[in-house]
């Protein structure tokens, strides 16, 4: 330990003592030392120098305009005296360290208040005007071992007018003494003037005492061996540090470094024998090697702290030499871990622990973390461990993947894969080096997923989709997204599933009644899966649309027809299944399905027919809903598609205005009876084509028809009216035993019922002759009146079907809870004739469109080959056409002289103007 005292003018002695705190100690400046008086270091006599002012005492602030640029410099400048303890250099940041030494320093100021400051061992301390490079020069200012020499040198400095406020002689146990100086500013310097620091080197450098080098090295060697053997060091660490500095100052650094390396190498070599025992268990061996490594690191940190001056001067200036810490790593790597037997046993033990953990056993993870950190510090992690680790991982998961794919169902297997990936990610965080991350995760993904992509999908995708296993599907997509090409394989299977499942809905005629609803449900299902499971991936959305378009058109025309009927069922009056808002959403969903069908003209034909019924019979649930659907169709298909449908609505509006005028006209006519006539004027080009049917109307009805005809043609001359009896409907008043009822019936039902005002019983043939109704239509009419829910007629004999010999009477005992009763007409399951007629009209319209397209193209191109003509026709048409049908239309146009075959090339056509 060193003590330092200085005399002052007031006769009191201020003492700076060093305290030991875990390492070695050194005098350190205090933050409050600026108030401490600067005194001259003499032989103990009171200085005759006048007391220095407070301004002059603050040496650092008065000597440089940049005094605040370094905290360390400020602290040192403000001390009352300076020790010969060397400035400490910062540690190499690249050297790992698990501990550090602190210097505990207390400086007694003039106020006698101890101020404690701790400096980290790595911190830089430097005197004003000195740095590490001046180590040798500053040593020349050291006095000999006697205090007299120090006093003599101080007198020399005074004679040379060097401004040095104090010089302290410090005597060391090793016989060397060294003084350091604190430089003050010029006392008489003017404010704002330039301030100079004058430092003059000492001329003489004292010689080392005899045997000093050997004795000093012996002390250092004993200290190093004590550290290596974990015994107490009998020398003060500060003394040892100073000894190293002294040796370095006298250019003995090279030999000192060599000796230090040798003693460290000898100690490490002696450790290898304990690891060559074959009887050691692998875990015990790992613990032993880890303990050896931890001890080595701790020892090298302490050794380096003693030889820090050597590390920061000589070693730093010689780039070919490793630092003391790196030297320790090299020696441990060369003599311990590079031993093939030790290395193999270490790597085998680490791999065994990892394998046990993967099998579910509990292991010492901190041991693994320490050992793998050791391999990384020794720079053999990748070459010695990582390659073998990845090979073992690949082997383990390859076997596991093959086994579990056969034993487990897909959901269980997917959860297992996810668990494995999470475990490996945790290992990377806990003890593996981050450089292993990419290779490790890629290996697991390849063996558990990449090798089984197709097998997983073929084995379980359909079940997951059928059962709507949202969580499992989400996990499936998440895992497949990690593997290169995984999403593409999933996408292909996704398309195949939609096509296969959708085809079962469309192709099977038995599902016609529920086809549209099933399509809507299926569409909702796949949309939900895409949104939740596939994260709205655009590729899956487009693939779904293509798949729907493919399977829904496998059965031409029928889906379009059924979609039209489904819309009719939703827009018809009496549909109380949904609110207006729900109905609007339903129509939006139907339009999505509608986009997929090719035969939109088929939809239009059936939709128009059903719309006509709703409008004429007043069955529309909502005019707003009807117009909303019309707007959606117009937006989807264009104005040309909906022009006729819009014309139907216009006809209904005009008919209302005409009937108001007709009622005013009727008030001036003397017409017997109380029949009220309502007529809808329909433009033939807008409405579906109806087959006219001549029936025998009662004279009263005929009379009213003639009156209306006279009225209408009087306003619109040149027009022709054609009565459509199939669309007529009436309200009859009837009296039964239970009371009066109103019957809402068709015109044909009306004609049959009115006959029973003239008689009580009629045969089928008699009714047919009297009404003139066509046989099939009459049978359906009688069936609705005598065999339906509201049986206002009785049939003899009883039965569900109408036979030739059947007779009918009025059912006077008819009962019903309602006053107005609607008796529905029995429809021929879309009457085969009516359906065929509608389809035929569609085909006829298509022929016209094909002919028009061919003529337009030929008129523009004049001459064209068959293949190019067919290609351009396909591009213009909005519905599918078979090549054979297209060829027939071309032949038809040739026959009608619209075009001709080229005489030289039969495969080429010429337009005929």
From Swiss-Prot:
Compartments reported by the entry: Cytoplasm; Nucleus
Stretches with biased composition (Low complexity): 25-35, 60-70
Pathway named in the protein's UniProt entry: Protein modification; protein ubiquitination
Outcome reported for the amino acid change (mutating residue 58 to A): No impairment in nuclear localization
Biased composition (Polar residues): 42-52
GO cellular component assignments: Cul4-RING E3 ubiquitin ligase complex; Cul4A-RING E3 ubiquitin ligase complex; Cul4B-RING E3 ubiquitin ligase complex; cytosol; extracellular exosome; nucleoplasm; nucleus
Coarse class of the protein's main subcellular location: cytoplasm
Matches recorded under InterPro entries: Cullin, Cullin_CS, Cullin_homology, Cullin_homology_sf, Cullin_N, Cullin_neddylation_domain, Cullin_repeat-like_dom_sf, WH-like_DNA-bd_sf
Coiled coil spans: none
Chain positions with Phosphoserine modification: 53, 100, 146, 193
PROSITE patterns (UniProt xref): CULLIN_1 (PS01256), CULLIN_2 (PS50069)
Stated role: Core component of multiple cullin-RING-based E3 ubiquitin-protein ligase complexes which mediate the ubiquitination and subsequent proteasomal degradation of target proteins. The functional specificity of the E3 ubiquitin-protein ligase complex depends on the variable substrate recognition subunit. CUL4B may act within the complex as a scaffold protein, contributing to catalysis through positioning of the substrate and the ubiquitin-conjugating enzyme.
Disease: Intellectual developmental disorder, X-linked, syndromic, Cabezas type: A syndromic form of X-linked intellectual disability characterized by severe intellectual deficit associated with short stature, craniofacial dysmorphism, small testes, muscle wasting in lower legs, kyphosis, joint hyperextensibility, pes cavus, small feet, and abnormalities of the toes. Additional neurologic manifestations include speech delay and impairment, tremor, seizures, gait ataxia, hyperactivity and decreased attention span.
Family: Belongs to the cullin family.
UniProt name for this protein: Cullin-4B
Organism name: Homo sapiens
Top-level taxonomy: Eukaryota, Metazoa, Chordata, Craniata, Vertebrata
GN (gene name): CUL4B
């Amino acid at each position: 330990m060193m003590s330092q005292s200085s005399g002052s003018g007031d006769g009191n002695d201020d003492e700076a003592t060093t305290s030991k705190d875990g390492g070695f100690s050194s005098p350190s400046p205090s933050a409050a030392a600026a108030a401490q008086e600067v005194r001259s270091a003499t032989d103990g006599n009171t200085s005759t120098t006048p007391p220095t002012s407070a301004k002059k005492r603050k040496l650092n602030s008065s000597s440089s305009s940049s005094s605040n640029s370094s905290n360390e410099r400020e602290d040192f400048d403000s001390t009352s005296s300076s020790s010969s303890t060397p400035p400490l250099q910062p540690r190499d940041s690249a050297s790992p360290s698990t501990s550090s030494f602190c210097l505990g320093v207390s400086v007694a100021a003039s106020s006698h208040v101890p101020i404690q400051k701790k400096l980290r061992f790595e911190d830089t301390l430097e005197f004003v005007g000195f740095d590490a490079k001046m180590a040798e020069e500053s040593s020349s200012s050291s006095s000999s071992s006697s205090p007299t020499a120090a006093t003599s040198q101080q007198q020399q400095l005074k004679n040379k007018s060097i401004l040095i406020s104090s010089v302290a002689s410090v005597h060391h146990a090793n016989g060397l003494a060294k003084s350091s100086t604190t430089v003050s500013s010029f006392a008489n310097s003017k404010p704002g003037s330039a301030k100079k620091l004058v430092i003059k080197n000492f001329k003489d450098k004292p010689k080392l005492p005899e045997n000093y080098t050997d004795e000093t090295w012996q002390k250092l060697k004993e200290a190093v061996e004590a550290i290596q053997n974990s015994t107490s060091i009998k020398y003060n660490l500060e003394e040892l540090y100073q000894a190293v500095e002294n040796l370095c100052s006298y250019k003995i650094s090279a030999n000192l470094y060599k000796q230090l390396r040798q003693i460290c190498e000898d100690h490490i070599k002696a450790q290898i024998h304990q690891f060559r025992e074959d009887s050691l268990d692998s875990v015990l061996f790992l613990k032993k090697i880890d303990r050896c490594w931890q001890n080595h690191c701790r020892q090298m940190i302490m050794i380096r702290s003693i030889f820090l001056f050597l590390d920061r001067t000589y070693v730093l200036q010689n780039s070919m030499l490793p630092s003391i810490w790196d030297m320790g790593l090299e020696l441990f790597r060369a003599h311990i871990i590079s031993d093939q037997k030790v290395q193999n046993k270490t790597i085998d033990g680490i791999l065994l622990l990892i394998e046990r953990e993967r099998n579910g056993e509990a292991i010492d993870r901190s041991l693994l973390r320490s050992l793998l950190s050791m391999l990384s510090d020794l720079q053999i992690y990748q070459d010695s461990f990582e390659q073998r680790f990845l090979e073992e991982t690949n082997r383990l998961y390859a076997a596991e993947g093959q086994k579990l794919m056969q034993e487990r169902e897909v959901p269980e297997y997917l959860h297992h894969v996810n668990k494995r990936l999470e475990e490996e990610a945790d290992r990377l965080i806990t003890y593996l080096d981050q450089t292993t991350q990419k290779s490790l995760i890629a290996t697991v993904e390849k063996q558990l997923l990449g090798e089984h992509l197709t097998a997983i999908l073929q084995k379980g995708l359909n079940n997951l989709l059928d059962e709507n296993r949202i969580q499992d599907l989400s996990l499936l997509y998440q895992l497949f997204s990690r593997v290169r090409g995984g999403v593409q394989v999933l996408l292909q299977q996704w398309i195949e599933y939609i096509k296969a499942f959708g085809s079962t809905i469309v192709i099977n005629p038995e599902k016609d009644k529920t086809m549209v609803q099933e399509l809507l449900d299926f569409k909702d299902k796949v949309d939900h899966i895409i949104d939740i499971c596939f994260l709205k991936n655009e590729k899956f959305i487009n693939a779904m649309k293509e798949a729907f378009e493919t399977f829904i058109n496998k059965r031409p025309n029928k889906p379009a027809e059924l979609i039209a009927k489904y819309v009719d069922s939703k827009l018809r009056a009496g549909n109380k299944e949904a609110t207006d808002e729900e109905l609007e959403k339903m129509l939006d969903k139907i339009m999505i399905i509608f986009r997929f069908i090719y035969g939109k003209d088929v939809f239009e034909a059936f939709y128009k027919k059903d719309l006509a019924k709703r409008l004429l019979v007043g069955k529309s649930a909502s005019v707003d809903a009807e117009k909303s659907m019309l707007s959606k169709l117009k937006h989807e298909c264009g104005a040309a598609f909906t022009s006729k449908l819009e014309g139907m609505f216009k006809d209904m509006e005009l008919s209302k205005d005409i009937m108001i005028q007709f009622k005013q006209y009727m008030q001036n006519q003397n017409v017997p009876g109380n029949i009220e006539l309502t007529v809808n004027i329909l433009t033939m080009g807008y409405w579906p084509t109806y087959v006219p049917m001549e029936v025998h109307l009662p004279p009263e009805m005929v009379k009213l028809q003639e009156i209306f005809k006279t009225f209408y043609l009087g306003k619109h001359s040149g027009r022709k009216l054609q009565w459509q009896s199939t669309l007529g409907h009436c309200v009859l008043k009837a009296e039964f035993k239970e009371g009066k009822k109103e019957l809402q019936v068709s015109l044909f039902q009306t004609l049959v019922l009115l006959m029973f005002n003239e008689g009580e019983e009629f045969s089928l043939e008699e009714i047919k002759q009297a009404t003139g109704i066509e046989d099939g239509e009459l049978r359906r009419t009688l069936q609705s009146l005598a065999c339906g829910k509201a049986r206002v007629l009785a049939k003899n004999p009883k039965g569900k079907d109408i036979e030739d010999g059947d007779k009918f009477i009025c059912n006077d005992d008819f009962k019903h809870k309602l006053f107005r009763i609607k008796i529905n007409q029995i429809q021929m399951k879309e009457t085969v004739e009516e359906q065929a007629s509608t389809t035929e009209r569609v085909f006829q319209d298509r022929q016209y469109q094909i002919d028009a397209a061919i003529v337009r193209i030929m008129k523009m191109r004049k001459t064209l080959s068959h293949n190019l003509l067919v290609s351009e026709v396909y591009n213009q048409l909005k519905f599918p056409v078979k090549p054979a049908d297209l060829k027939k239309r071309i032949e038809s146009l040739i026959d009608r002289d619209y075009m001709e075959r080229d005489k030289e090339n039969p495969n080429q056509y010429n337009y005929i103007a």
